[in-house]
Amino acid sequence: MSGHSKWATTKHKKAVVDARRGKMFARLIKNIEVAARVGGGDPAGNPTLYDAIQKAKKSSVPNENIERARKRGAGEEAGGADWQTIMYEGYAPNGVAVLIECLTDNRNRAASEVRVAMTRNGGTMADPGSVSYLFSRKGVVTLEKNGLTEDDVLAAVLEAGAEDVNDLGDSFEVISEPAELVAVRSALQDAGIDYESAEASFQPSVSVPVDLDGARKVFKLVDALEDSDDVQNVWTNVDVSDEVLAALDDE
């Protein structure tokens, strides 16, 4: 559970300097476009758009790309795609549960790419509802430590509705109900604490521990899924120990 968060954080940092940067940018741009289409193009009145823009800025997406995506979503500029969100469920090797969120303009292509990635990497597709019950939708705010302690963060967010603060090594993640996400993010801002991202996510209620070989197989599958332009997010309930994580980082 926490292991997957740590791995995602590590991969995010590496993604800034490797070939996945372009795919990461594309996902962030899609988020902005969809948020503007659903809730309007003014970030001040659309918290989801505000958070999508902030995350893109933190990831060094050029401002002009961000603004064009906002305008396309809001209908101020032509060219916006008809993005649809589709969820797929399945299992990775070792019985690890996988939730796959696609944001696509072609449902058939998305379904095909997800199935191929799963099949070729030891995964199996599952019926709707047979995996998702293992996860709860939560609000997640991620922030770099920058000298902060867990108590510092808790003091800032506890009254705003935060449920938990997880230590991810170099960063913290603050968990809340999705409805409290904006309040938690605002509480951090009011306390002068900078944050990396604030978004709705899926948190596993039960985790599956794996050894080094198991972790390799799970993350090989996750990487294959994330190679699809239609896949927006992948969540698993894998639990990776610090020792296994360190061994993966060395590979």
Curated annotation (Swiss-Prot):
Superkingdom as given in the UniProt entry: Bacteria
BP GO terms, sorted: regulation of DNA-templated transcription
Keywords: Cytoplasm, DNA-binding, Transcription, Transcription regulation
Main location group: cytoplasm
Name of one Pfam family that matches: Transcrip_reg
Keyword Cytoplasm: yes
Location(s) in or outside the cell: Cytoplasm
CC annotations in GO: cytosol
UniProt GO MF annotations: DNA binding
PANTHER family in the cross-refs: TRANSCRIPTIONAL REGULATORY PROTEIN YEBC-RELATED, TRANSLATIONAL ACTIVATOR OF CYTOCHROME C OXIDASE 1
Name of protein: Probable transcriptional regulatory protein MRA_2631
Originating organism: Mycobacterium tuberculosis (strain ATCC 25177 / H37Ra)
Organism placement in taxonomy: Bacteria, Bacillati, Actinomycetota, Actinomycetes, Mycobacteriales
